[in-house]
């Protein structure tokens, strides 16, 4: 036995298993400005005290393991360990608790969402002592957020590039999402942009399939953009999905988009991965491309109330990793999204400084310092009758995206785009005149439809369409 081993044993090392709370539950701890703070919804197994469950989360997501190890003596555990510093019961829920955990900054690689998530939402989510575990929120300190580039450009730079101010931007996802040839796809893009939309979009699962290879789609969409710009005098864009099976292929597609001179590309950031997304965001900033982000797969992670991760955490991660737009629900459409919760993470995407507000699900005050903001995209089951509510809920700094609500118009794609543009302009004008869109919205749309036959036809088609289901993710 070496002298060092004997010394280790002599100062108190004892093999075996001990309660996590003896080391990782520290209610006396005063959090530091540089700590990353996490709020976990913890559901312990029967018989497991909440303090032990919270301490287990802190341990397993930082320096701990299931047994005492002698190599703990070779480092300063107090410097590097996560600490569960507070636990509170969830009102109205049996055996559920919010455990607050503080992590020292040195645990995480600079500028890496991948490394951050590998620790905080890694193996701990399979821990047997917990029936369920959900990460509700993270506080990212400026000392860490400043190690990230963030969005390639941000809201103000995008508006300057597009020369569009004072209203939400309008988009449309091309449908059917799969099966069109590249030429017919480009035709649909042209018709929608000519009709008055600012953007059209690849659906998230349009990559490079046998019926439409990516290079052909990019070329026909670029042709559509330039033709629509020449006819309307407005800057137009199409979200060309660069998502691919490898990072190298993804970058090849982004490079080709830049060579075509188009303004924006797209990435599926959860299925593509944070490493790929951050790489693409860096390329987009360096080469003047806007970056639209789709959140495909998010509901697998965030929809269950007691297990997984809330979308507000995914939204913060995206702002750090990089994206100029991200889908954020609609409140009024076909996809999940309760109003106060949605507006909470919309503010986390757009604003520089967001105060703690538990009524909106915001557990921590978040200071983004100078990191650019991200435009929230409202998309999914929306049509012209939703325009007043969307304008009132999301405000000017947003993208309102109507897929079926454009391409489903009885007269075709261009009239569908006209209907949406007329409805939007009417709502913005009414709001600027001081009218209450929440109360008078339907009347605003009816008035505009009297002089726009395209809008009148759209109003007739979708007058009975509603998606009246209760949201699952509520406070």
UniProtKB/Swiss-Prot annotation:
PTM statement from Swiss-Prot or TrEMBL: The disulfide bond which can form in the large chain dimeric partners within the hexadecamer appears to be associated with oxidative stress and protein turnover.
Top-level enzyme category: lyase
CDD domains: RuBisCO_large_I (cd08212)
Classification via InterPro entries: RuBisCO, RuBisCo_large_chain_AS, RuBisCO_lsu_C, RuBisCO_lsu_C_sf, RuBisCO_lsu_fd_N, RuBisCO_lsu_N_sf, RuBisCO_lsuI
Membrane-spanning intervals of the chain: none
Co-factor requirement: Mg(2+)
Modified residues (N6,N6,N6-trimethyllysine): 14
A GO molecular-function descriptor: ribulose-bisphosphate carboxylase activity
Function recorded in the entry: RuBisCO catalyzes two reactions: the carboxylation of D-ribulose 1,5-bisphosphate, the primary event in carbon dioxide fixation, as well as the oxidative fragmentation of the pentose substrate in the photorespiration process. Both reactions occur simultaneously and in competition at the same active site.
Subunit description: Heterohexadecamer of 8 large chains and 8 small chains; disulfide-linked. The disulfide link is formed within the large subunit homodimers.
Name of the featured protein: Ribulose bisphosphate carboxylase large chain
Species of the source: Cedrus deodara (Deodar cedar)
Name of the encoding gene: rbcL
